[in-house]
UniProtKB/Swiss-Prot annotation:
Transfers a GMP moiety from GTP to Mo-molybdopterin (Mo-MPT) cofactor (Moco or molybdenum cofactor) to form Mo-molybdopterin guanine dinucleotide (Mo-MGD) cofactor. This is Molybdenum cofactor guanylyltransferase. One of its GO terms (molecular function) is nucleotidyltransferase activity. Its cofactor is Mg(2+). One of its GO terms (cellular component) is cytoplasm. Belongs to the MobA family. It catalyses: Mo-molybdopterin + GTP + H(+) = Mo-molybdopterin guanine dinucleotide + diphosphate. The N-terminal domain determines nucleotide recognition and specific binding, while the C-terminal domain determines the specific binding to the target protein. Mg(2+) binds at residue 104. Monomer.
Amino acid sequence: MKNPIIDNIPCVLLAGGKSSRFITNNIQTNKALMPLKSYSSLLEYQYTRLLKLFKKVIISTKKSYELNAPYLLEKESDLFSPLFGIHNAFLTLQTPYIFFIPIDTPLVSFESIKALCGIKNFSVTYAKSPTKEHYLISLWHQNTLNALIYALKTQNYRLSDLVKNTSSVAINFDKEEEFLNLNTLKDYELAVQILKKRANG
């Protein structure tokens, strides 16, 4: 069955991170460019996959990639915080709600994303797995803009502080696996195995 497309909420793929813990052959590697399944990069995999669910997918990053897609460029070159991408997205897209997801969480199911996008009476609706809060796999409302501006002004880049100071709600999901974050090469290799298993299952 084809997924009904979410056409009233844009999806912003957060890809402006540092990849500081992602090391291949003793070299820090940009994980966005690691191949995944039949795709040339994690970036292409996530972008293509999310377009099956959202009418509009935009990539938030520090510089545009070869992948032909709409980009939101973060101006802060030496500072790495997803708050810049979230703030920039609201200023640029001028839309009440935006769904955010990091590039390095390729296993999140469409069911989970739809559940998060279905709860609209909070400033931030975020995913929570058995062991962790996932503040970046979340639906945000534009009424968080003042809090975002204040956090950036005071240089408090802790997402948890900002989310807890807004009217936020955690949606509990029981599968830890789908929220695997590809911080390291080991995480990436695990995700490759999981996707292989899913394809064969």
